[in-house]
Amino acid sequence: MANVVENLGKLERRVTISLPKDVVQKEIDARIQKLAKNVRMPGFRPGKVPLKMVAQQYAGQVEAEVLSDKIGQEFFTISRAENLRVAGQPSFAPKEDTQQESAYAFDATFEVYPEVKIGDLATAEVERSTTTIGDAEIDRTLDILRKQRVHFHARGEGGEHGDGGADTAAQNGDRVTVDFVGKIDGVAFQGGTAEDFVFVLGEGRMLPEFETAALGLKAGESREFDLKFPDDYHGKDVAGKTAQFTVTLKKVEWPHLPEIDADFAKSLGVEDGDLTKMRAEIKENLEREAKRRTQSIVKNQVMDALLKISELDVPKALIEQDQQRLVEMARQDLAQRGVPNAKDAPIPAEMFADQAERRVKLGLVLAELVKANGLEAKPEQIRAEVDEFAKSYEDPKEVVRWYYSNQQRLAEMEAFVVESNVVDFVLGKAKVTDKEVSFEALASATAQA
């Protein structure tokens, strides 16, 4: 008898599954007999419990298990016979109105994968960012590296680096050590008092009123000031309230940036301290980083372009599955940050609805494009990417071994190669406009993506 597949919508389908009761009962009896060999009941030795008593206690459970197994097996058989590309998990429900004495009947409702229509790639528009690394970018990087290695010296102390000038008052950029006491309506509050508290003026770590009060003070001086906490301040007990603070400055230290010399170059890993080599290595690293960032931007551009020219209906079941996947990823992220009970965090799946739909839709489009154009990752491509990635580490061979020792890591690299193949394929057919951008703009664009 041919299976009738009902069309309930664009992607939703339904089939009826019929299971002969004698076949089901035969399997139930076989499982109960097997179960009886190990069942323990008071008053009976193991394996000696009467079969009738075992059936009375376990028949309902065993019947449910058998029906579940048989329904799943039959649905798999039907889906293969009818060439159904089932998306997600089907739902099964008893077909009450057609129950027969000789058979169980169930409705299986499910979705199928959609037909994916990808438009003319020649109509896709992609803006490709390019950047040139010159002396200005190298100098900016050196400035950042110098600031990361800053040393502080107390204002007024003598020594190799002087005293930072005649003015010993706290200035922007100085590191200050303070004691402070805060009260609201004359009462101290939690977190409002501290001793030997250290921060750098001008970094924005403290509220503006606090930084303003510390500016211009010299060691041993105090200042009183009012501070209104923002309404959205993280400390709910004081949010929106005004506190009266007294801050006492104990120490002022001025920043001393290291000179760009051989010692500085050695601190960056240039063994002989050669400044030309140092600049060349910085340039190489910046070019590698620029390449990575431009690839990321152009990949997103290509993916957006593919979505614009593609037509398909997205299975709800796949969206719901991906929403749950994103919820679990969010919980794992919270756990890594040390949030208590993160695995049970009440994160609503609905907040990921749009993101999940885009991810699923893009996955279907990419799968169709890869299949239609033979863009699968080749072993030599995967190895080339692993080797390229390993170059930035001290022991490239160990990094390569690390990748090839774990199938999941290798699968992630394979997915990256497939995406790269897709990007190259689309760029070869789309309308591509090259745009020169600065390294700073490039870094900003990828940070916001």
From Swiss-Prot:
UniProt-listed Pfam families: FKBP_C, Trigger_C, Trigger_N
GO cellular component: a single term: cytoplasm
Gene3D superfamilies from the UniProt entry: 3.10.50.40, Trigger factor ribosome-binding domain (3.30.70.1050), Trigger factor, C-terminal domain (1.10.3120.10)
Keyword Cell cycle appears in the UniProt entry: yes
Keywords assigned: Cell cycle, Cell division, Chaperone, Cytoplasm, Isomerase, Rotamase
GO molecular function, one term: protein folding chaperone
Location(s), subcellular: Cytoplasm
Functional description taken from the UniProt entry: Involved in protein export. Acts as a chaperone by maintaining the newly synthesized protein in an open conformation. Functions as a peptidyl-prolyl cis-trans isomerase.
Domain notes for this protein: Consists of 3 domains; the N-terminus binds the ribosome, the middle domain has PPIase activity, while the C-terminus has intrinsic chaperone activity on its own.
This protein's name: Trigger factor
Species of origin: Burkholderia mallei (strain ATCC 23344)
Lineage: Bacteria, Pseudomonadati, Pseudomonadota, Betaproteobacteria, Burkholderiales
